[in-house]
């Protein structure tokens, strides 16, 4: 096999690969063996005709397709390795020369991993990030605990809806006297004053009693997310089926004993404050790291192939689809709800995808420049962390499987973490 390489443009190369006639002839024999049973030739049982006879009846090129695939599948990866090329897309294959007794020659034009010109990534300066724990943060956490432990009581039939009550309702919505999709619900629990429903829907239920039917008039926002409803006036026929009230427990030492491991309110407040501080510190650390990494990326120069951005957008769309699936929504429904299309979403994702690709390329180049590697032990430790997240009872076995099946991913994760640490450790926080 002979391989020559020509640079076509930035990040695009063309390989010319010459496969010896002997090798191509072997590929033709394999193609014949694979396809011979498909041919009916007079004078021969099906699948028994010699190659020469089949070619005479069906043409010289009848076995070329599979022979070409066999040759390319074998030689293309070797050509990439010989020329130390890392492709980021599938190649465009063109046949240059082919024929019985001849060398098989083809070209493969492919987009390759771009070159990265690193700028400064050590000695970077970024503003120090910190978040104080406020008294209101602690109070809000206590109120959330209070809400979670509220007792729900059903109000008497003659009692009316008040703000903060939970109304169990049936409703049906109309626009221009016509019911609209998604405008109907049964036994829906609506907390009055929560702002769950649009406009002043909830306020119009205040004062209503169990068994009462109300007509509620609203106007949808101009940017509601549905072409059918944007800016439209609507009315809802609402039936009040039940009214409930939340009885909030007092936030005192007795409450603390019931909902936590502590005996006094002061002890719980200190614990809440410590946990909020821990979360704030993690947030500040992550934001500082992101700022410094962004600076390192801004200082680097790289011409990113469009196909890499498109591939990243594809990954982002798959992630979105998976998250939506957990909520029982598919992409088409999501597009309808958000008054969008796949094309619009892809365009919206493009900036973030480009940033992700550049960050990955820059971090990989820093790792190369600093000769950072991941040991087998580090990869196994990361696999164990992942296995713990899966909640696997057989930690060692699961970790071993992950270390084998996800080796490249785990290795990249470990190396990236080292790169981030190196850049951050060599940076300077400024006030």
UniProtKB/Swiss-Prot annotation:
Q: Does the keyword Zinc-finger apply?
A: no
**Where in or outside the cell is it found?**
Cytoplasm
Q: Name one GO cellular component term.
A: cytoplasm
Keyword Cell division on entry: yes
What's the top EC group for this one?
isomerase
Q: Which domain of life is it from?
A: Bacteria
Q: Which InterPro entries match?
A: PPIase_dom_sf, PPIase_FKBP_dom, Trig_fac, Trigger_fac_C, Trigger_fac_C_sf, Trigger_fac_ribosome-bd_bac, Trigger_fac_ribosome-bd_sf, Trigger_fact/SurA_dom_sf
Catalytic activity line of the entry:
[protein]-peptidylproline (omega=180) = [protein]-peptidylproline (omega=0)
Coarsely, its chief localization is cytoplasm
SUPFAM superfamilies in UniProt: FKBP-like, Triger factor/SurA peptide-binding domain-like, Trigger factor ribosome-binding domain
Per the record, the GO terms for biological process are: 'de novo' cotranslational protein folding; cell division; chaperone-mediated protein folding; protein transport; protein unfolding
Q: Where is the PPIase FKBP-type domain?
A: 164-249
Keywords on record:
Cell cycle, Cell division, Chaperone, Cytoplasm, Isomerase, Rotamase
List the molecular function annotations (GO) for this entry.
peptidyl-prolyl cis-trans isomerase activity; protein folding chaperone; ribosome binding
Disulfide pattern: none
Q: Where are the transmembrane segments?
A: none
Query: EC annotation?
Result: 5.2.1.8
NCBIfam families given for it?
A: tig
Q: Which family does it belong to?
A: Belongs to the FKBP-type PPIase family. Tig subfamily.
Question: Which comment does the entry carry about domains?
Answer: Consists of 3 domains; the N-terminus binds the ribosome, the middle domain has PPIase activity, while the C-terminus has intrinsic chaperone activity on its own.
Q: What does this protein do?
A: Involved in protein export. Acts as a chaperone by maintaining the newly synthesized protein in an open conformation. Functions as a peptidyl-prolyl cis-trans isomerase.
The protein depicted here goes by the name Trigger factor
Organism field: Clostridium tetani (strain Massachusetts / E88)
């Amino acid at each position: 096999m002979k391989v020559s390489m020509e640079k076509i443009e930035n990040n695009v190369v063309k390989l010319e690969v010459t496969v010896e006639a002997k090798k191509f002839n072997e590929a033709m024999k394999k193609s014949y063996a694979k396809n011979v049973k498909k041919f009916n030739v007079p004078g021969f049982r099906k699948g028994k005709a010699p190659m020469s006879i089949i070619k005479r009846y069906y043409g010289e090129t009848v076995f070329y397709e599979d022979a070409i695939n066999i040759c390319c599948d074998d030689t293309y990866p070797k050509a990439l390795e010989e020329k130390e090329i890392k492709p980021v897309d599938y190649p465009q294959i063109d046949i240059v020369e082919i024929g019985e007794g001849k060398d098989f020659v083809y070209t493969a034009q492919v987009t390759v991993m771009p070159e990265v010109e690193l700028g400064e990534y050590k000695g970077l300066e970024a503003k120090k990030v910190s978040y104080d724990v406020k008294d209101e943060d602690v109070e809000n956490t206590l109120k959330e605990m209070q809400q979670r432990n509220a007792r729900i009581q059903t109000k008497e039939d003659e009692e009316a809806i008040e703000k903060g009550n939970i109304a169990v309702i049936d409703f049906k919505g109309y626009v221009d006297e016509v019911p609209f999709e998604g405008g109907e619900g049964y036994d829906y629990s609506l907390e009055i004053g929560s702002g769950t429903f649009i406009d002043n829907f909830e306020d119009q239920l205040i004062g209503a009693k169990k068994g009462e039917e109300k007509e509620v008039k609203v106007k949808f926002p101009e940017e509601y997310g549905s072409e059918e409803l944007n800016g439209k006036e609507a009315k809802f026929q609402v039936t009040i089926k039940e009214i409930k009230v939340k009885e909030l427990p007092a936030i005192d030492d007795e409450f603390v004993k019931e909902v936590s491991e502590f005996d006094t309110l002061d002890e719980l407040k200190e614990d809440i404050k410590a946990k909020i501080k821990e979360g704030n510190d993690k947030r500040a650390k992550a934001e500082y790291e992101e700022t410094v990494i962004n600076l390192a990326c801004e200082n680097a120069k790289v011409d990113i192939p469009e196909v890499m951005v498109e591939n990243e957008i594809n990954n982002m769309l798959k992630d979105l689809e998976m998250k939506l699936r957990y909520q029982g929504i598919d992409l088409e429904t999501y597009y309808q709800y958000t008054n969008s299309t796949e094309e619009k979403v892809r365009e919206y994702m493009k900036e973030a995808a480009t940033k992700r690709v550049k960050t990955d390329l820059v971090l990989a180049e820093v790792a190369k420049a600093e000769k950072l590697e991941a040991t087998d032990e580090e990869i196994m430790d990361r696999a164990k962390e992942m296995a713990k997240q899966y909640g696997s009872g057989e930690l060692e076995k699961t970790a071993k499987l992950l270390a084998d099946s996800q080796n490249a991913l785990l290795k990249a994760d470990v190396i990236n973490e080292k790169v981030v640490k190196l850049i951050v450790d060599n940076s300077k926080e400024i006030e």
